[in-house]
């Protein structure tokens, strides 16, 4: 193995090196293109570079030695020790470069959001004014592809050269027609920046890698009887190896093995260790990881050649191996083989900065890689050092197992299916001959001349054409054969026609573009087919084709769209949120009010408004499902913050003086933990930080294995005693405020808590299902457990298909025994729970407000009575309730006043 570093082989500006981001080699192995921070695309002559390998083969000798002198004389002239040309048409950093499979085109992507298509121009170009040396070659821009909204990170051509895919930081995957360079599709299905793209050498799939920690496998194939018109489907999403992959890498450049069996994906993790994930074709499993790098891996690249394993026994089938090179932020180049569990060679600190791109020569024995230090380094392996290279015919045989030689829309599910299809051709023909009796040949009869009646029959058939609905909601008319013959139809053709019709209706997408009227331009947005205008449905066109992509081939039979699945998920999520945060408790909880919104009620009201102002009778499901604002629970409670004032006692040991201080509790919730223990990290624990005003140091910092939603300080006689922490699933933990130690074991309520109250040493908790729990914290005893509020919420109003429950307007805790006091919005009555009677009692009846019954009550009950009276007066003004009008005599009014006063005396 030889490592070649040439001082002038790289990117420099004014004797200063600049970052180099991309390298690529053409199919002949004669040209290498590089791009970097200087915005230039440089073309290098590999014939000139390879001469230096020959000089490295010879042993080092003195300068006076004649052999060394001859070698130096055989080196290329100093005027050739530079790039053949340097093109500066980009307005930003060149981040990606790829030669087309035939070597004619060179695609370059940049952070100026533009992809340029270059072609070599053989015409002689005069020397530019102000330049010392003119370019030895001239490359010109043929197309400018404009569609991205942010930096282009990677580019890849399909193996047949008919497709070009670009990905970028705008999370878009844009597919171009590589013949006309029109935009075919744009998919924005990734949730974050897309940093890698690779095509299957069998020309059936391509894969994309994104910062959303997923690798998506796309299947594509040509449509039936349509030239260069493709169908795209989502095949699989790989998640497991990338759950904890870092987001610090600039690239995620993948590579597909030349035999089509494996995908090498960088920036994966195996536990806490950086790794390279190997994805198997077919089941898309990712059980294999290449572990050896000490920092995230940026790029992987398979050698384009298969190598024969030398020690294969003679009586066994010849085995092959593939070789992959990996590099990343640890400045290390590693060469791996599929027949070894350890790397063939590891070159540590081979460069001074991160490795950004790797490319192999067509013979598979020389590689070049770029680096952020601006250099381009070459590595050449000796003859048979990696193994015996196999012929291209054997590689084609390996790819033909996956249908590389087929362009049919009938998709093979496995290699065995392709073999069975070949075997079944002859058997199918034999079985048909056995079923059909041998008949003597008869002279052909002249077909009868069609009559006008047959035309009438055809018109009736045309009127009964089959109309199908695609996933995007568009209507399509199935084509019918218009025959001018009056001969009867063949009965045997009916099942075939039905099968074809079903198959054509399962298509997910159709061509969304035609050739533009003004010719093929740089950027083609396409023109919708005029046949779609026949539909009466108005559609809002988006700048992507996400609705046209399918999940997989088997899912086409179900015809379930992504939008429908998304609506189902949102519907289930809303139901869970309504169960977890009932709208009846939104006024008594200190949680954000948006969590308690009843989405069903909101949608019904919005539907009424929409139908009143719209000409359409039916409201679309998309509008109905998107009316309610969704709240991310994890984002809302990522930090829980409480600040409160209290008295602090004097402590001579700690040097604390008595006085009024302010304490802050900050809860930093970790990520939701998975059920799988192996996926849990200590870094994901919830952190509780307690600080005091005026004290630079923290009082203490606690860690919990659950995510905290509620924080309740317990203050007795103006002195802070305890902190009460409650999780999302009803785990209640009481902590001593002085030391941070546990006061008691964790309470498990089994469901989320809506609100918490405390008074005079009592703590009251209300859960999402309406159950009350109360404890005496002084004696550490329970006062009431699992008391349901349903007894006083049994009044409900039915409106259409929904049930409107009464809203709890106020909630307080009785300081005498810790029982709840509840104010209802519908009746304005105040209820309390009697621990002695073990039932709910009506503490204050709003019916007696009309006669002015009054009494001096305690502070807690007085506040609820004021709220009740204000709501009562508001209902009178809005005529929700009607008060009784007394006669001229005051006997009835006096009797009611006495009865109301009697009820108040019982409190």
UniProtKB/Swiss-Prot annotation:
Q: Where is the composition biased (Acidic residues)?
A: 538-550
Question: Which keywords does this chain's UniProt record carry?
Answer: Chromatin regulator, Nucleus, Repeat, Repressor, Transcription, Transcription regulation, WD repeat
- Where does the protein principally reside? nucleus
InterPro entries recorded = CAF1B_HIR1_beta-prop, HIR1-like, HIRA-like_C, HIRA_B_motif, WD40/YVTN_repeat-like_dom_sf, WD40_repeat_CS, WD40_repeat_dom_sf, WD40_rpt
Q: Which domain of life is it from?
A: Eukaryota
Biological process (GO) annotations held by this record are:
chromatin remodeling; chromosome segregation; hyphal growth; mitotic sister chromatid segregation; negative regulation of chromatin organization; negative regulation of transcription by RNA polymerase II; negative regulation of transcription by RNA polymerase III; nucleosome assembly
| Keyword Transcription included in the entry's annotation | yes
Q: Which GO terms describe its cellular component?
A: chromatin; chromosome, centromeric region; HIR complex; nucleus
Pinpoint the residue ranges of every WD repeat in the record: 15-54, 89-128, 147-186, 189-228, 292-346, 350-391
The GO terms describing molecular function are: DNA binding; identical protein binding; nucleosome binding; transcription corepressor activity
Under Pfam families, the record lists: Beta-prop_CAF1B_HIR1, Hira, HIRA_B, WD40
Stretches the record annotates as Disordered: 532-552
Location(s), subcellular: Nucleus
Q: Which PROSITE patterns match?
A: WD_REPEATS_1, WD_REPEATS_2, WD_REPEATS_REGION
Q: What's the family? A: Belongs to the WD repeat HIR1 family.
Q: What does this protein do?
A: Required for replication-independent chromatin assembly and for the periodic repression of histone gene transcription during the cell cycle.
Listed name of the protein: Protein HIR1
* UniProt organism field: Candida albicans (strain SC5314 / ATCC MYA-2876)
What's the encoding gene here?
HIR1
């Amino acid at each position: 193995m030889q490592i070649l570093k040439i001082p002038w082989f790289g990117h420099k500006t004014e004797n200063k090196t600049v970052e180099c981001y991309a390298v690529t080699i053409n199919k002949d192995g004669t040209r290498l293109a590089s791009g970097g921070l200087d915005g230039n695309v440089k073309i290098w002559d590999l014939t000139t570079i390879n001469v230096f390998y020959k000089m490295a083969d010879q042993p080092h000798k003195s300068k006076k030695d004649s052999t060394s002198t001859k070698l130096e004389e055989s080196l290329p002239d100093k005027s050739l020790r530079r790039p053949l040309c340097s093109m500066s048409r980009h307005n930003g950093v060149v981040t990606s470069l790829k030669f087309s499979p035939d070597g004619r085109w060179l695609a370059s992507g940049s952070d100026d959001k533009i992809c340029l298509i270059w072609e070599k121009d053989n015409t002689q170009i005069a020397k530019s004014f102000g330049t010392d040396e003119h370019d030895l070659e001239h490359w010109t821009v043929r197309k400018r592809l404009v569609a991205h909204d942010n930096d282009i990170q990677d580019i890849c051509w399909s193996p047949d050269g008919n497709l070009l895919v670009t990905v970028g930081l705008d999370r878009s995957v844009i597919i171009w027609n590589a013949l006309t360079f029109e935009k075919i599709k744009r998919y924005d299905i990734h949730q974050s920046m897309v940093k890698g793209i690779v095509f299957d050498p069998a020309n059936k799939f391509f894969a994309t890698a994104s910062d959303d920690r997923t690798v998506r496998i796309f299947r594509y194939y040509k449509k039936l009887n349509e030239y260069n018109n493709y169908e795209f489907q989502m095949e699989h999403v790989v998640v497991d190896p990338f759950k904890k992959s870092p987001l610090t890498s600039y690239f995620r450049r993948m590579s597909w093995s030349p035999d089509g069996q494996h995908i090498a994906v960088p920036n994966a993790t195996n536990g806490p260790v950086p790794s390279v994930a190997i994805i198997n074709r077919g089941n898309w499993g990712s059980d294999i990881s290449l572990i050896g790098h000490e920092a995230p891996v940026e790029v992987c690249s398979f050698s384009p050649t298969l190598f024969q394993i030398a020690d294969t026994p003679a009586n066994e089938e010849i085995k092959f191996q593939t070789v992959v090179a990996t590099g990343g932020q640890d400045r290390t180049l590693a060469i791996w083989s599929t027949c070894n569990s350890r790397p063939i060679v590891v070159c540590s600190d081979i460069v001074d900065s991160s490795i950004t791109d790797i490319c192999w020569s067509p013979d598979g024995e020389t590689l070049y890689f770029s680096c952020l230090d601006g250099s381009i380094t070459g590595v050449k392996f000796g003859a048979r050092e990696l193994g015996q290279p196999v012929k291209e015919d054997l590689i084609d045989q390996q790819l033909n197992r996956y249908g590389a030689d087929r362009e049919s829309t009938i998709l093979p599910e496995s290699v065995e299916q392709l073999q069975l299809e070949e075997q079944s051709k002859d058997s199918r023909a034999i079985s048909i001959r056995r079923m059909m009796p041998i008949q003597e040949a008869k002279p052909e009869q002249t077909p009868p001349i069609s009559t006008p009646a047959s035309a009438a029959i055809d018109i009736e058939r045309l009127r009964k054409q089959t109309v199908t609905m695609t996933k995007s909601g568009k209507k399509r008319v199935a084509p019918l054969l218009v025959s001018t013959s009056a001969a009867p139809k063949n009965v045997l053709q009916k099942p075939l026609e039905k099968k074809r019709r079903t198959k054509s209706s399962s298509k997910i997408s159709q061509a969304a573009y035609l050739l533009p009227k003004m010719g093929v331009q740089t950027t083609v947005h396409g023109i919708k087919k005029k046949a779609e205008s026949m539909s009466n449905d108005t559609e809002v066109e988006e700048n992507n084709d996400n609705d046209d992509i399918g999940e997989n081939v088997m899912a086409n039979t179900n015809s379930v769209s992504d939008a429908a699945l998304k609506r189902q998920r949102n519907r289930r999520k809303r139901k869970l949120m309504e169960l977890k945060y009932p709208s009846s408790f939104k006024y008594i909880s200190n949680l954000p009010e948006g969590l308690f919104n009843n989405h069903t009620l909101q949608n019904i009201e919005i539907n009424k408004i929409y139908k009143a102002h719209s000409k359409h009778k039916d409201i679309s499901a998309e509008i109905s499902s998107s009316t309610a604002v969704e709240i991310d629970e994890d984002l809302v409670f990522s930090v829980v913050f409480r600040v409160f004032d209290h008295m602090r006692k004097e402590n001579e040991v700690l040097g604390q003086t008595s006085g009024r201080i302010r304490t802050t509790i900050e809860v930093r919730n970790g990520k939701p933990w998975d059920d799988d223990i192996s996926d849990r990290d200590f870094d994901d624990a919830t952190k509780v930080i307690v600080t005091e005003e005026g004290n630079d140091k923290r009082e203490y910092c606690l860690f919990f294995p659950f995510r905290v939603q509620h924080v309740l300080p317990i203050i007795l006689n103006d002195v802070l005693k305890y902190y009460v922490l409650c999780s999302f699933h009803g785990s209640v933990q009481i902590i001593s405020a002085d030391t941070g130690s546990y006061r008691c074991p964790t309470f498990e309520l089994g469901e989320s808590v809506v609100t918490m109250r405390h008074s005079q040493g009592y703590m009251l908790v209300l859960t999402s299902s309406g159950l009350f729990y109360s404890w005496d914290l002084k004696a550490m005893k329970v006062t009431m457990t699992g008391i349901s509020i349903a007894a006083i919420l049994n009044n409900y109003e039915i409106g259409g298909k929904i049930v409107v429950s009464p809203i709890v307007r106020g909630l307080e805790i009785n300081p005498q025994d810790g029982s709840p006091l509840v104010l209802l919005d519908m009746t304005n009555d105040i209820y309390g729970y009697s621990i002695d009677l073990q039932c709910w009692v009506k503490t204050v009846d709003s019916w007696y407000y009309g006669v002015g019954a009054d009494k001096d009550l305690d502070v807690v009950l007085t506040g609820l009575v004021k709220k009740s009276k204000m709501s009562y007066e508001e209902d009178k003004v809005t005529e929700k309730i009607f008060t009784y009008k007394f006669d001229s005599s005051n006997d009835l009014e006096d009797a009611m006043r006495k009865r109301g006063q009697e009820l108040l005396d019982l409190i």
